[in-house]
Amino acid sequence: MSLTAALWVAVFGKCGPPPDLPYALPASEMNQTDFESHTTLRYNCRPGYSRASSSQSLYCKPLGKWQINIACVKKSCRNPGDLQNGKVEVKTDFLFGSQIEFSCSEGYILIGSSTSYCEIQGKGVSWSDPLPECVIAKCGMPPDISNGKHNGREEEFFTYRSSVTYKCDPDFTLLGNASITCTVVNKTVGVWSPSPPTCERIICPWPKVLHGTINSGFKHTYKYKDSVRFVCQKGFVLRGSGVIHCEADGSWSPVPVCELNSCTDIPDIPNAALITSPRPRKEDVYPVGTVLRYICRPGYEPATRQPMTVICQKDLSWSMLRGCKEICCPVPDPKSVRVIQHEKAHPDNDCTYFFGDEVSYTCQNDIMLTATCKSDGTWHPRTPSCHQSCDFPPAIAHGRYTKSSSYYVRTQVTYECEEGYRLVGEATISCWYSQWTPAAPQCKALCRKPEIGNGVLSTNKDQYVETENVTIQCDSGFVMLGSQSITCSENGTWYPKVSRCEQEVPKDCEHVFAGKKLMQCLPNSNDVKMALEVYKLTLEIKQLQLQIDKAKHVDREL
């Protein structure tokens, strides 16, 4: 192969096997695995598809990729039509491969297939199954019952929603639903629903309720559907209905319960003590609404922000209280402090150092120092520390200070603000016992004096500090456009926007100003002239109308 030919193949290449297309097939059998560039392969649409264009080929482009010039679209099945007493659900469309589903209206049974697919039949496509039929459901003769009968004995057949009613013989009680109806199960078969009733002789025993007494309904013998009313004894509350009924199974229902109408068992709150006076006893009972107060033991604090109380609730339970959590003292820095001895006052807690703990420690000078953990989580006389220097001074917004690599006791730093900001607070702070004092100042934005024409400011200064508020008052004869009160914001601007004071226009002059604005908006002199003529005519008509009104008024007086 020549060098030119090799380069040609390397640059343009060949095409591999053509892709498998779901909608088209090669027009002839192919045994090749690669194809020269510019090769054209003829294709035909697969069964179920029809041509959508004249070109039906694959073309091998010079770069070794196939270009698809085939357009085949799915064939469409005919509309299946409407299903009497049912419906046809089209899942997507009527195209090849699509599916439709058939279902019957309530009370009808489907005879035939419930689905049909658009499939290949011969050279075209058609539905796999014909339109089914929906026929009304029918039930057999209603079942007979012992000691009773139904009213449908004269009927020959029963269709969907037909019903019959049962009646018991004398001295028997009907249990269940007196009427049953012809229904459809699984859209395939007609059945009677619900189950037919039964006719029984029912007697219930003498009713008893713990901590309750019968209030009404006394009888020697209780039969089915007889009722009794109960009331609870003093100190108990009724849970459920106070009226019970003799049921079909010979029992009473619903069973009432008389519960103690108070809270009991004072809750034990972790790490807290009860302070309610007089002090309650464990065996006491507490009406709904009773409040018990607790206080955290030394070295503990409330676990939440809720009050340290529990309340006897309407459901006769005590409200929840998380109790108290430990207050731990901070752990001394092990890099600078050497703890010699640690005496734990209360071993059973999760704190490294807890209320009452005492530590003995030394610094580089080997002087023995002691500190005790207090109940509020602080050390006395101070947190064990050997540091004499301070951390970096606090950074402030829009301000700066001269930085240093270290800050020892009595070191001072001075803050200054950026241009456009004013320093509020002490400019100089000092390092004192590992803390900066006093608090760092703030740099607040400065706003320029608002320019107000025809008005005055409540506070007249050249500059205003951030958050400062100013009130604007317009001169007599002028009205304010905007907010009367404005505030200097953190970006050095006034918020809301500075208002304006404009001359108040009497109502009689409004049409004059409107005419003036109209003249300013007209594009050329001819339009202005025309507008003036119209305006003049309008004024003359108004003047004439005034004269007519005046004449009418004179005539009335005469």
Swiss-Prot record:
Keywords: Complement pathway, Disulfide bond, Glycoprotein, Immunity, Innate immunity, Repeat, Secreted, Signal, Sushi. It comes from the Eukaryota. Glycans are attached at residues 31, 177, 186, 469, 491. One of its GO terms (biological process) is positive regulation of protein catabolic process. Disulfide bonds join 15-60, 45-72, 77-118, 104-134, 139-182, 168-199, 204-246, 232-258, 263-312, 296-324, 329-373, 363-386, 390-431, 417-443, 447-488, 474-501. GO terms for molecular function: complement binding. SMART domains: CCP. One of its GO terms (cellular component) is plasma membrane. Disulfide-linked complex of alpha and beta chains. This is C4b-binding protein alpha chain.
